[in-house]
């Protein structure tokens, strides 16, 4: 799919990977709508050509209204986290916190279920997951469970959506606002998390966004 001239909706598009993706889509000539619960977060890093909207992916009425107002569109990127994920040993974890981690899955579920009917016939959907879906460490039970569910959801749904396409981009450790505010603690967290990697640094939101755009553009992925 050529991006120039297309219309794209990026949910969770005002911070981190979502904002980087929205910016690159706009830079390549797409008309972009970026939505999140707090669109004001994007103002400092906003690229021209991006329209901001307030929308919570867990609010189905608001989401339906957004899709209806913006229809038809060609590209849907789901990068909204749905909130924090629980971390730490499972046997010490509050079960409500573990259950709450699945807000990301429900946000994606709402977005695809309500959005696909407003997309063009050969539209493309990209979901953002994460490496713990396939390779996990102690303390990542929630991350692994949610990511695995997102990826299974995508695989099962792909045949139903054809000729529209749905794919997952699943990055490793990425330096985004989810790691907290700037400072030594943030730096230490990122260095510790990537110390054993062949390339011992965190990835960037822009690097993940490049992968998202590659997935959108490469029609070979209709066969995957």
Spans of features found by a protein language model:
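Conserved glycine-rich cofactor-binding loop
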Residues: 7, 14-15
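N-terminal Rossmann NAD(P)H-binding glycine-rich loop of SDR-like oxidoreductase domains
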Residues: 14, 22-23
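Rossmann-fold cofactor-recognition segment
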Residues: 46-61
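Hydrophobic structural elements of the Rossmann-like NAD(P)H-binding subdomain
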Residues: 77, 126-128, 166-169, 179
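Conserved NAD(P)H cofactor-binding loop of Rossmann-fold oxidoreductase domains
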Residues: 77-87
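Catalytic loop of short-chain dehydrogenase/reductase
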Residues: 89-111, 124-162, 173-174
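A glycine/serine/threonine-rich, flexible loop-to-helix segment
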Residues: 174-196
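C-terminal substrate-recognition "lid" of short-chain dehydrogenase/reductases
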Residues: 201-224
């Amino acid at each position: 799919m050529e991006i120039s001239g297309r219309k794209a909706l990026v949910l969770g598009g005002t911070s981190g990977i979502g904002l980087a993706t929205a910016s690159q889509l706009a830079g390549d000539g797409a008309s972009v709508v970026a939505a999140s619960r707090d669109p004001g977060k994007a103002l400092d890093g906003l690229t021209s050509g991006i329209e901001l909207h307030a929308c919570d992916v867990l609010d189905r009425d608001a989401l339906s209204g957004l899709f209806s107002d913006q229809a038809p569109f060609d590209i849907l990127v789901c990068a909204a986290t749905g909130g924090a994920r629980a971390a730490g040993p499972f046997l010490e974890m509050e079960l409500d916190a573990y259950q709450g981690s699945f807000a990301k899955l429900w946000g994606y579920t709402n977005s695809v279920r309500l959005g696909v009917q407003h997309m063009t016939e050969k539209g493309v959907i990209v979901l953002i997951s994460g490496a713990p879906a396939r390779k996990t460490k102690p303390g990542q039970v929630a991350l692994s469970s949610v990511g695995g569910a997102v990826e299974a959801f995508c695989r099962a749904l792909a045949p139903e959506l054809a000729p529209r396409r749905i794919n997952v981009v699943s990055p490793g450790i990425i330096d985004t606002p989810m790691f907290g505010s700037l400072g030594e603690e943030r730096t230490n967290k990122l260095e510790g998390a990537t110390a054993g990697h062949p390339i011992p640094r965190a990835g960037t939101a822009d690097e993940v966004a490049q992968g998202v755009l590659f997935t959108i553009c490469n029609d070979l992925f209709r066969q995957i």
